[in-house]
Amino acid sequence: MLSSRTVAVFLLMTPLVPSVLAQRSESTASLLLRFDNEHDLAAKEHLLLTVTNKDAGAGPPLLRLAESTTNSDTRWMAMRGMATLRYTDCAPFLEASLKDSDALVRSNAARALGDLRIGNASTALLAMFAAEQDPEAIQQASAALQMLDIKAAVPLIREKLPVFTGQTREWLIGALGMLGSIRDVPLIAGYLDDDVSGMAATEAIRELAGVSFGPLSLSTNGGVNGYPPPETLAARAWWKSHKVEWPHCDDCHPKSSR
């Protein structure tokens, strides 16, 4: 059985879609009260969808609830609701929430700032990203940094790459591929042999160096085409024959510790 926090992370990654019929007879205030008091995350998500589908003007009451609730799940889910409703007046609250003690609150605050394209949040996002140690929060912050095109994050991304593994490293490589420059190719190429991050490294190099490694495979490990996919093999061969063209860099050798 999935833990409540695992379900929470899944919900974090699931966009709000108009798939729940609005309960027209119930007021937004009543729905939000039930939403705050609900502890089952799936039911809580259902109530949030009902609110956002029913009331396009629910941004202000969602913000008031997020500011006043003692339930951290209510707080981070309300942030998602405000982002869905494009309620940009919540930006100061989101920025303050980047320092929250709950990782899911920080994650969603960062992601909502990106989704809402709050460009003047770059300083706060950079500070949060620099200090962040939670993998899921790192992932969502890296997505927000990409959405806001915060290129000043590149040195921080380079620092975090060898520290985190798995999916978090994939997100970081993807962010570096979008925010970095051709000077970042050697660092990224060091992950081409990684079973988890190899495909992300391939795509990042394709983006930064403008090199085509062939069509994207639709499968990964265990798929029809097997692993590594042809484009990653092509990227490895390309790097082997071209790496002498790049200067040596001290942080180009991955040292995994997380």
Please place each PLM-identified region on the residue numbering.
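Terminal, low-structured helical/coil segments at or just beyond the last alpha-helical repeat
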Residues: G214-R258
